[in-house]
Amino acid sequence: MGTPWRKRKGITQVGTMSPAIALAFLPLVVTLLVRYRHYFRLLVGTVLLRSLRDCLSGLRIEERAFSYVLTHALPGDPGHILTTLDHWSSHCEYLSHMGPVKGQILMRLVEEKAPACVLELGTYCGYSTLLIAQALPPGGRLLTVERDPRTAAVAEKLIRLAGFDEHMVELIVGSSEEVIPCLRTQYQLSRADLVLLIHRPRCYLRDLQLLEAHALLPAGATVLADHVLFPGAPRFLQYAKSCGRYRCRLYHTGLPDFPAIKDGIAQLTYAGPG
């Protein structure tokens, strides 16, 4: 009879100690939540709430955003469409888009460089595509690549709603890894004066090296890469700084609607194969 009693006693002691241990860790948990509250809000908004709304509505966030644009934006006015998307992201659901601060950097560079041909890798909902298209010089051409067909369908409708036709903005559905080797033969792109990398940062280095390997970057070409600090593209940045073929500049920004989360855009100027 004694042994079972001791076991029960041991279990009782462990049970009474667990809340005490949890209480001891409470200050640490609170400190971490306060320090990383912006990341926690981002996680809740982009993963938990978004997944719930996807299930309830049967639509993806990009499709819900486009429905909002249809009822609130002026067709044929890309600036008003962009402002409407910004309002949606700030007041309705967070949209993982470039946002107005980074957008101004992008538009200024497109206007300064006046590229004849721009290649965008990562169309997403079409936000940055509209930024580039409205800043292109007369006769300029934009090829934008999106790997997800459903997202690409939304972007296509947004681009056409803004008033840009297929001759000015061509959307290609496929992964950057598959599309880049085919650009010269299938899409008559012999050079990209400006390239925007705005999809998975872990793929940026691969994409850059593919562009080099297929001789699609002329000397003086500009390569812009978003999200190089968050979530980050350290291998891409290290390569660009150490290979000797690029001049690098980093624009420090925050995430749209989360300015406390630090991010940045890298601007590379290609010097040539060397």
Swiss-Prot record:
The keyword NADP does not apply. It is an enzyme of class 2 (transferase). It holds the Pfam family Methyltransf_3. It comes from the Eukaryota. GO terms for molecular function: catechol O-methyltransferase activity. PROSITE patterns: SAM_OMT_I. Keywords: Catecholamine metabolism, Cytoplasm, Deafness, Endoplasmic reticulum, Hearing, Membrane, Methyltransferase, Neurotransmitter degradation, S-adenosyl-L-methionine, Transferase, Transmembrane, Transmembrane helix. The keyword rRNA-binding does not apply. It catalyses: a catechol + S-adenosyl-L-methionine = a guaiacol + S-adenosyl-L-homocysteine + H(+). The chain crosses the membrane at residues 14-34. S-adenosyl-L-methionine binds at E120, G122, T123, S128, E146, S176. GO terms for cellular component: apical part of cell; cytoplasm; endoplasmic reticulum; membrane. Its EC number is 2.1.1.6. GO terms for biological process: catecholamine catabolic process; developmental process; dopamine metabolic process; methylation; sensory perception of sound. PANTHER family: CATECHOL O-METHYLTRANSFERASE 1-RELATED, TRANSMEMBRANE O-METHYLTRANSFERASE. LRRC51 and TOMT were originally considered as alternative reading frames, LRTOMT1 and LRTOMT2 of the same LRTOMT gene in primates. Belongs to the class I-like SAM-binding methyltransferase superfamily. Cation-dependent O-methyltransferase family. Interacts with LHFPL5, PCDH15, TMC1, TMC2 and TMIE. Interacts directly with TMC1. The interaction of TOMT with TMC1 and TMC2 is required for the transportation of TMC1/2 into the stereocilia of hair cells. Catalyzes the O-methylation, and thereby the inactivation, of catecholamine neurotransmitters and catechol hormones. Required for auditory function. Component of the cochlear hair cell's mechanotransduction (MET) machinery. Involved in the assembly of the asymmetric tip-link MET complex. Required for transportation of TMC1 and TMC2 proteins into the mechanically sensitive stereocilia of the hair cells. The function in MET is independent of the enzymatic activity. This is Transmembrane O-methyltransferase. It comes from Propithecus coquereli (Coquerel's sifaka).
